[in-house]
Structure formats: structure tokens, C-alpha cells
């Protein structure tokens, strides 16, 4: 975005002098800071921020950042590597300075220039990253650095990350915007801004989530500021929901709307027009659709055939996007319309989703686009007036009068299913009445099922050999199929074997022999696995085995962690069924087994355990259904109690009686 503002030479000189004087000077550390070995305000912390200062000035097109960090452990030394992302071609990272101060007061300055790395490139736009490493860092050191980003002819209103990965003692944030766009500003002005669509921008908007008792101050000098102290680090707990939407931060942006209602009415309408333009039903699309469907096809037949066709294309989010020169050599062009993606037989997830939208409409189906915030990243917040918070495009069909949500941009996702990231996700959607807010349906546990079926031969010493089949549908199957797109099958087997280590008992090796249904998203994915090793504890007369062959180690944190600050996010509900059959040799019989049991958590989850005894076999079946996705902190004790009861049930023992001496069995007597 550019300004129609021309600065005089004197203004340029003034700009340079103000920028130089705005740089924060390095501070003399106190004796307490130098000798600090731990921080009572942040027990166990690897490092803490002593100071942060971030100053942005849009009229002068610059921002500065300054930080002082106390390193308290070896891990804290990682903060000596500083990365500064920036947009090449318009922005410059300048005036980088830094130093390391040892606990004895010795100062080691930063020398040399930062490395300049290319992060990504799309078309003519390149994102770079300046990287520098503060020297001679030790546990106990203070790291101090600053840098400036010059915005050239662009403006870039700031986003302040008030809450960070480490405790912050004090921080100061300051932003000077264009006064012409301040609330209440009026009167004629020759200055204006254009957004990416060429529209005039006339309002400054901000979104703030601050610690209790703190507020964004508008100062008499025409700048905003926030001063904070003792900011806790970003929470870090197992199974946390994405918390980006809940962190302490402040975002500023210039927009043409003054309130959320006006903003989304305008932006959603423009988004819908852009979608329709890309998904235009051109001659190429109509001919392609005609070759894929038949006149006698039902609406569902058409929808499925077209879905299979776009899923078969090269999704460059899972492979590699062709460069501009490659497209030129192949006489292709950047995708601006659905027909471009079809001609290229490739596209990213967004392009493929909108290609499906175009083809569905061309086939006579009622189809609308919906764009949502990925649940792996955050939640949709209409009060945050920024269309960029939306991530992924889905397609909502009406088939025989019933709504069907599909996820064509999610490679290997079956028709009628969506990635867990897109279930229960909010955003905007098209409709016959025009665009508006919407939330996708949540998933059910029946959408995601795993069955483990093991057949095991065991001897009196607990040595086992056997086979295991793991059959999955839903999200776990989708995960492994997408992984198979990026690596070969040998590497996939290694990764799957690694995942098995978390569920089989210690002393047992599990190795994948082969997969079935790996390339067919509509099939059950099966992994055929060999088992060998030793389980249980053996004596001369008995063999003691764990009641549950498979362990739920992934949930042990719920058992051991007494308190919870954040919600528990399971990602998606699912059902797990297990059947383990032990084949017993002559001379071994079942002496004792746990009683059949159920552990319910009303409305949320249920656990079931059952044993079946036959003369030469013992079969243990186990089931866990988690019918919830999110548990609030006030529900944590109920959740913890459920998994404690599950752990107690799993830790029971199967008792096998040995009626013949092991030595005789070994000789076959």
C-alpha cells in the first residue's frame, strides 16, 4: 500500500534525524541483574526479558525494536539467535547493534553484518529474514540488541506482541499514526492511502487484548502507547487449544470502515466477488465438466466425480509449486481463474478448492464458498477487522436439498469429510441471501475410528511373536496419507514404527510390514505389523501380564498434572477399539483376569474393558470413546478423574498359571 504523499528535502532530513534520535540507547545493567541466577517472578524460567521497547512511526516510515534478556539456563542461550523477517523490495532492516554482558560485567559487542536469508517467494514478492547471533553467550549473560526497519514508501501499522514465550519484566510500546486518520479527525487533506484494491483508506482501527488494568493510551502528542510490567509467558501445556486469539497483543490497521459491521459487510461482499471471478464457468471448465459426468448422473454422482477429478490434480501445498520461468516454458500462466488451474493440472489448496466450486456450479449444482480460520491456529473473531485472519476455503453443496460440506483443497480428504482444522471453524460464507458469518459443523467420534487387532503367541517366559493390524478412518488416516505424499514408503514405515513405540509395552518391537489402502482416501487405511519381544513378569509358576497390551501414554500428563490453566483441546473426537488374543501353549491356563468394567464420564467419554477365556486362548477387548473436542479448565478435574480411572483399569494384571515346568515346556514335554 502506498501514499500519495511527497516529502520535501527538509522533511526527509528531519525524518532521518528523528529516526536516529529515536533509537533506544543501551542500558547499564544493575548489580542485581548481573548476579541473577534465577527469577522469583518466573520460577524455573530458562530466560526472562528485562526490558522490551517497540516504537513505530508511520508518517516517518520506520519502526525500532530493543530488548534486554537475562539468560538463566543452557536452553535460554537459544535467544542469542535473533531473526527479523521483512518484505524485500520495500523494507530494509538497518542499524543492527547488540552486545553480550557476562555476569562479571565484561562486554562483548556484536560485530559483522547479519545474514540475509530468503524465506519465501511468490511471484515478485520475496520475504527475507535477517539473522544475527549475539557473541560469547553464557548462562548468566545479559543479551542486549536493537534494530530498525525502514518501510520506504510503504506504511506498515504495527502488531505488538505483548505476551511472549518468556516472562517480561517491563515493556514500552509506542505508535505514531497518520493524524489525518485518527478518530475524530476531519477537514480537507491532500493525503490519502490506497489499500490493495485501490480503495481510499480513511480510518485507523485497533484491536487490543491487554492484561487486567492496562489500557491503550492516546497521548496528547498524537501517539498511542502501552506500558506493561510482569507479563506472564505464553502458556505451555499439553493439549492446549491454539491460543493466538487469546494472547495479550495490540493490532493497528488502516481501513475504510469504522466498525465491524460495516467492515465485514464490505469485505465479505468483495471476497465473494473475487471468489466468483476466480470460479468463473468458462468454456474450458464447461468442457472439462462435460467430459467427467454423464447426463444420467445424480447430483451426488456429479459431486463425487468432480471431487475425485480435482483431488487427483497436483496440490502444490504437498509437492512443489512451479516457478514463473517454468510456467513460461510450459506456456502456462499464474492461476487467475479456475480454468488456469485446470489447464496446469495443479494448484495450491485455495486454487483447487475454488476450481471445484467452478466445476460444481458448471455441473448445475448449488455450491457456495466458505472461508474459515484454521482451528490449528486460532478462532474467528469478527471484532478483529482483518480478512487475513481467514485461512482456508471449503465448498458447501446442496445435494437433493441437503447440505454437504466438502474440503477439496485438503489432499486425500474423502468426499463429505473435512480436516479437523476445518470442523467447528468460523468464518464467512456465500449464500443465496449474500455473504455472512458461519461456523462449520463439529465432528462426531464416529467420524474418526481406529481399530487395533492383535494375535499373539506367548510362552511361559513371556516371549511373544505375533501380528497386529491397525485400521483407521478419519483424521488419523488422513494424517498418514498426507505424510505419504511427502516421503517414500520406507521413510513412512520408519515414522509409523516410531509412533508404535508409544502404544506397545516396553520390551516389545513393532514393525510395519506393509500398508493397505494408503493411496485411496475412500478406503480403510490398514497397517500390517509384526510383533516380537517380551511382556509381563514370569516366575516358576505364574506369568503376570498387563491387562491392557496397548498403553495410552499420550494421556499420562492428565493423570500426573494436578492443575490446569488452559482448556484441553483433543483436536477431534474419536473412537478406539482394541482386541488382543493371546494363544496359550499347553501347560499354561488363565488363573485370574480383571472383571469386565466400564468407566464413564457422562456426556464426554467412556472406557470399556472385557476378557474372554477359552481353553487355549485369552482375548482382551478394550474401548475408549472420547466424544468431546474441548474441555474447559473447570472441567479438568472430571477429565483427570476419567483418565486416572482408565490408568487404574489398564494397570490391572492377567494371571496365567504354569502347570508344567518351563524347562519341560522348552523340551516339548
Task: Annotate each PLM feature.
Residues 1-5:
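Positively charged n-region of N-terminal signal peptides that target proteins for export
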Residues 6-17:
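Bacterial N-terminal signal peptides
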Residues 22-669:
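A sensor for short, sequence-defined functional sites
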Amino acid at each position: 500500500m502506498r501514499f500519495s504523499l511527497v516529502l520535501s528535502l527538509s522533511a526527509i532530513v528531519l525524518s532521518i534525524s528523528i529516526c536516529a534520535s529515536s533509537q533506544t540507547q543501551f542500558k547499564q545493567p544493575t548489580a542485581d541483574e548481573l548476579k541473577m541466577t534465577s527469577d522469583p517472578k518466573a520460577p524455573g524460567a530458562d530466560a526472562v526479558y528485562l526490558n522490551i521497547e517497540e516504537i513505530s512511526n508511520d508518517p516517518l516510515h520506520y519502526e525500532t525494536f530493543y530488548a534486554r534478556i537475562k539468560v538463566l539456563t543452557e536452553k535460554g542461550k537459544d535467544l542469542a539467535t535473533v531473526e527479523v523477517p521483512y518484505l524485500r523490495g520495500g523494507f530494509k532492516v538497518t542499524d543492527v547493534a547488540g552486545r553480550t554482558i557476562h555476569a562479571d560485567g565484561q562486554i562483548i559487542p556484536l560485530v559483522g553484518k547479519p545474514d540475509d536469508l530468503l524465506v519465501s517467494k511468490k511471484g515478485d514478492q520475496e520475504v527475507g529474514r535477517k539473522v544475527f547471533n549475539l557473541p560469547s553467550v553464557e548462562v548468566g549473560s545479559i543479551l542486549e540488541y536493537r534494530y530498525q526497519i525502514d518501510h520506504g514508501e510503504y506504511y506498515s501499522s504495527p502488531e505488538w506482541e505483548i505476551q511472549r514465550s518468556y516472562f517480561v519484566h517491563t515493556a514500552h510500546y509506542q505508535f505514531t499514526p497518520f493524524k489525518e486518520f485518527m478518530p475524530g479527525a476531519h477537514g480537507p487533506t491532500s493525503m490519502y492511502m490506497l489499500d490493495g484494491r485501490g480503495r481510499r483508506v480513511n480510518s485507523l482501527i485497533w484491536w487490543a487484548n491487554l492484561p487486567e488494568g492496562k489500557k491503550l493510551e492516546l497521548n496528547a502528542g498524537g501517539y498511542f502507547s502501552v506500558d506493561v510490567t510482569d507479563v506472564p509467558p505464553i502458556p505451555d501445556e499439553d493439549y492446549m487449544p491454539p491460543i493466538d486469539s487469546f494472547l495479550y497483543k495490540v493490532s493497528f490497521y488502516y481501513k475504510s470502515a469504522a466498525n465491524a459491521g460495516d467492515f465485514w459487510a464490505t469485505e465479505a461482499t468483495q471476497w465473494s466477488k473475487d471468489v466468483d471471478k476466480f470460479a468463473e464457468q468458462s468454456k474450458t471448465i464447461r468442457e472439462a465438466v462435460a467430459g467427467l459426468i454423464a447426463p444420467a448422473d445424480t447430483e451426488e454422482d456429479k459431486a463425487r466425480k468432480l471431487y475425485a477429478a480435482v483431488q487427483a490434480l497436483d496440490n502444490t501445498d504437498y509437492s512443489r509449486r512451479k516457478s514463473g520461468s517454468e510456467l513460461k516454458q510450459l506456456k502456462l500462466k499464474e492461476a487467475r481463474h479456475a480454468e488456469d488451474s485446470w489447464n496446469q493440472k495443479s494448484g495450491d489448496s485455495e486454487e483447487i478448492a475454488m476450481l471445484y466450486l467452478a466445476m460444481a456450479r458448471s455441473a448445475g449444482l448449488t455450491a457456495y464458498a466458505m472461508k474459515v480460520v484454521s482451528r490449528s491456529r486460532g478462532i474467528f473473531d469478527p471484532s478483529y477487522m482483518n480478512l487475513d485472519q481467514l485461512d482456508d476455503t471449503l465448498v458447501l453443496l446442496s445435494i437433493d436439498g441437503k447440505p454437504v460440506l466438502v474440503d477439496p483443497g485438503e489432499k486425500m480428504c474423502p468426499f463429505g469429510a473435512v480436516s479437523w482444522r476445518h470442523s467447528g471453524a468460523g468464518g464467512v460464507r456465500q449464500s443465496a441471501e449474500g455473504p455472512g458469518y458461519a461456523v462449520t459443523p463439529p465432528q462426531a467420534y464416529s467420524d474418526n475410528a481406529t481399530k487395533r487387532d492383535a494375535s499373539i503367541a506367548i510362552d511361559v517366559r513371556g516371549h511373544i511373536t505375533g501380528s497386529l493390524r491397525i485400521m483407521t478412518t478419519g483424521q488419523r488416516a488422513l494424517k498418514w496419507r498426507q505424510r505419504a505424499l511427502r516421503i517414500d514408503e520406507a521413510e513412512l514405515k520408519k515414522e509409523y514404527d516410531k509412533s508404535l513405540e508409544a502404544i506397545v509395552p516396553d520390551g516389545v518391537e513393532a514393525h510395519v510390514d506393509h500398508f493397505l489402502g494408503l493411496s485411496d482416501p475412500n478406503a480403510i487405511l490398514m497397517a500390517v505389523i509384526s510383533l516380537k519381544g517380551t511382556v509381563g513378569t514370569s516366575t516358576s509358576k505364574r506369568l503376570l501380564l498387563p491387562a491392557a497390551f496397548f498403553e495410552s501414554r499420550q494421556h499420562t500428563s492428565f493423570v500426573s498434572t494436578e492443575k490446569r490453566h488452559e482448556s484441553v483441546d483433543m483436536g477431534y473426537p474419536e473412537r478406539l477399539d482394541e482386541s488382543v488374543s493371546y494363544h496359550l501353549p499347553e501347560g499354561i491356563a488363565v488363573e485370574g483376569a480383571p472383571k469386565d468394567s466400564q468407566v464413564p464420564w457422562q456426556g464426554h467419554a467412556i472406557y470399556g474393558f472385557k476378557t474372554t477365556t477359552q481353553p487355549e486362548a485369552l482375548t482382551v477387548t478394550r474401548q475408549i470413546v472420547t466424544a468431546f473436542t474441548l474441555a474447559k479448565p473447570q472441567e479438568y478435574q472430571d477429565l483427570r478423574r476419567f483418565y486416572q480411572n482408565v490408568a487404574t483399569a489398564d494397570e490391572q494384571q492377567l494371571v496365567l498359571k504354569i502347570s508344567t515346568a518351563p524347562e519341560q515346556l522348552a523340551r516339548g514335554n
